Amino acid sequence: MNWEITTFIAYFVILLGVALVFYFNGTNKNSEDFFLGGRSMGPWVTALSAQASDMSAWLLMGLPGSILAFGFGQMWIGIGLAIGTAANWILCAKRLRTFSKAANDSITLPQYLTNRFAVDSRALQLVCALIFLFAYTIYVASALVAGTSVFTTLFPDISPKIAMFAFLLIIVAYTFFGGFAAVCWTDFFQGLLMMAALMLVPIVVYFGHSELLDPTALETVYEYTDAATGAVTQCAFGGGIFNASWQDIVSGLGWGLGYFGMPHILVRFMSIEKPSMIKKSSIVAIIWVVISLFSAVMIAYFGRMIMGEELLTHGNQKLVFIAMSRKFFPAGICGLLLAAIIAASISTADSQLLVASSSFTADLYKPFFRKGASEKETLLVGRVLVLVLSLIAFAIANSKGSGAQAIMDMVENAWGAFGSSFGPTILLSLFWKRFNYKGAVAGVVSGFVVDLGWLLTGLTASTGVYEIVPGFIVSFLAAYLVARFTEAPNAEAVAIFEEATKPDAD
């Protein structure tokens, strides 16, 4: 019996079981239950589900692989994400929970941005919903590609299409049946698994196999040739963390700005049972991020000294976690550790799928097509859309055309687009009483345009500065200046602000 595969499969059977429990016990009675868990999530579930949905397989493959190949200068993105995570929990979490409740009990971010200013216009809600629907469908397609890549690496005898379809079925099943609550609970356990897996590998290496650590490997320059292009890449570990260029440092730290506008993370703040629970959630989330990122760095550091030549001469740096797990753990435990990689991929994909579905039903279907739709109908449409978006994402991910490749390339910039478009607007809506609807529209539109323009004109490549940095700055200035020099918000919007910022708001 192959214990690695058996353990791997058993883990996902348990995940599906969780979804079925939520489905058959009648947890999802209405759209707020399905899309926001009835605002009943506890502090631990809120914290770990938010972090698991944030950190995809990049945490276990991309980050350690990059550091393994090029040294500690690659850590700046991780540092930016850690700072951004902490700032998001400290600045936004509690306020967004109270503001979304005060703003007509909003269950999506586009709905919140409209209700927050108490206006009749649905233009901003429409624009935001369309951006969400498009971007998150592509995001899910990207997650399918990433998950399939991991799946076929672990199980090379399985064809990519079968692997992708199996991966899709797992995601769709517990999203469709379980809704937000099931997604949060499964992401909670997956968050624990991801952190445990990341911690266990360097601990076992350091305390059990330190004799294998070869410091000279840090000085050796390895190189590999890309089979497709013939390009030769040299992998020098380089100097310390400050060996990076100023552009890499600014761009890496700029990644942290994305959190303020990332819907599938912000919606976790809206779902917690009580605002007073946010403090505990914040502590848990920040500790999780610091430990997980530090562990990923140590995996790369130890991996370079133990199997740098084996991995880097073949361009397999992203497989360092897999290789270390298989080298130092028995098959049963290894299967669980490898499940953490797939868990990281699906914990991101399921959240994005649910946000896209909720945005369609709450921000497009009900306001524009079926204003009188019942809760039962809305819930059904949401579930159907989970299936539809999944199939579209599957088709995109399976496409071999250049157009599909261009779309997949755009996904890498979606984080910047969300952060630039929505980050400043969300922050100002939570902290500035004078902020108004026109300022919000200006912030969203200008941030998106500058972010996209910076990318399409080649400025990201020529300057080396990540597009979220200028996009966020321009969006913030536009939102502030337009709101400052246009009419003040109406009395209802001011009342919402005052209600949400009361000292006893809970």
Predicted regions and their residues:
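Membrane-embedded helix-loop-helix hairpins and adjacent transmembrane boundary segments
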Residues: M1-D506
